[in-house]
């Protein structure tokens, strides 16, 4: 009886280690989003911050024209993908119900090749993102929070 269960246990254990390709792809797009747009605890949030972060995140070959870093915690950003902190915006996007601290880095200077120079703009904004399977996968824009009149 024990020998009969051995192959089943082996198949079960091996099955636990296999990740369906769609889940692996979703996770990689989310990780790419975090690499490009997430920085929990920024330092400075000035031009030097932008130049350092853009280089550190490999966004300078060629120099990316504009990139925004969202500050705070990952859970709050994920919540934009749900009704907890987000609502539909346009055709395929979600806009945050609450504002986030963000730093937008804009490339200044002529050449699209390193060394890249960036100008920083920081502030509190609502973010617009695309989500797949409850995870942010694309940063679209940040907008000033509209106040009710």
Curated annotation (Swiss-Prot):
Quaternary data: Homodimer. Interacts with RNH1; inhibiting ANG ribonuclease activity. Interacts with PCNA.
Record-listed Pyrrolidone carboxylic acid modification sites: 25
Family the UniProt entry places it in: Belongs to the pancreatic ribonuclease family.
Lineage of origin: Eukaryota, Metazoa, Chordata, Craniata, Vertebrata
Protein name: Angiogenin
Organism: Oryctolagus cuniculus
Gene expressing this chain: ANG
Keyword entries, A-Z: Angiogenesis, Cytoplasm, Developmental protein, Differentiation, Disulfide bond, DNA-binding, Endonuclease, Hydrolase, Nuclease, Nucleus, Protein synthesis inhibitor, Pyrrolidone carboxylic acid, Secreted, Signal, Stress response
Biological process terms in GO annotation: actin filament polymerization; angiogenesis; antibacterial humoral response; antimicrobial humoral immune response mediated by antimicrobial peptide; defense response to Gram-positive bacterium; hematopoietic stem cell proliferation; innate immune response; negative regulation of apoptotic process
EC number from the UniProt entry: 3.1.27.-
